Regions:
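N-terminal signal-anchor transmembrane alpha-helix
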Residues: 1-47
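Alpha-helical membrane-associated segments of multi-pass integral membrane proteins
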Residues: 20, 36-39, 102-140
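Transmembrane alpha-helix entry/boundary detector in multi-pass membrane proteins
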Residues: 40-61, 111-119
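The transition from N-terminal targeting/processing segments to the mature protein
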Residues: 49, 55, 66-72, 100-102
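Canonical alpha-helical transmembrane segments
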Residues: 59-79
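Transmembrane alpha-helical segments of multi-pass membrane proteins
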Residues: 81-99
Length: 140
């Protein structure tokens, strides 16, 4: 198996992310960028009088990590392993995100949604990465 040496995250010849650390690092960086973008837009709208600051939906911060996960999903060959792993990771991610957002329910939507997005991002990566590899080995 040859490796592609063009940047970060490191990918194998099929375009799959090689390590869990790379997946977590890039997805968390995407989450931070997403949170900063939502904060910037929320601040801009609040300064124009279009609502109070902190009322934007922090769940929007999950867009970049979800895009990364979609690209990694597409890099795996067609089969049940990637679908089952994605469904399990999605269920774990949504559950972790909703629990995190629920525990922070008294906070503004920007913060509680951001915490929910962080819970989703972490849980999805931790379930997807080993899950798809294990299932791909099991199904051949």
């Amino acid at each position: 198996m040859t490796e592609q040496h063009s940047g970060f995250p490191r990918r194998d010849a099929e375009g799959r992310i090689r390590t869990l650390g790379d997946l977590l690092g890039v997805s968390l960086a995407g989450l931070v960028i997403g949170v900063l973008a939502v904060v910037l837009f929320d601040f801009a709208f609040a300064s124009f009088g279009a609502g109070e600051f902190g009322q934007a939906n922090g769940w929007l911060a999950v867009i970049l990590p979800a895009w990364l996960y979609w690209e990694d999903f597409r890099a795996w060959e067609f089969g049940a392993a990637r679908v089952v792993a994605a469904l399990a990771a999605g269920a774990a991610g949504v559950t972790a995100g909703l629990v995190a957002a629920g525990l922070a329910a008294g906070l503004p939507p920007l913060l509680s949604g951001g915490l929910g997005a962080a819970g989703f991002t972490l849980a999805y990566a931790v379930v997807w990465f080993p899950g798809v590899r294990w299932l791909a080995r099991r199904t051949g």
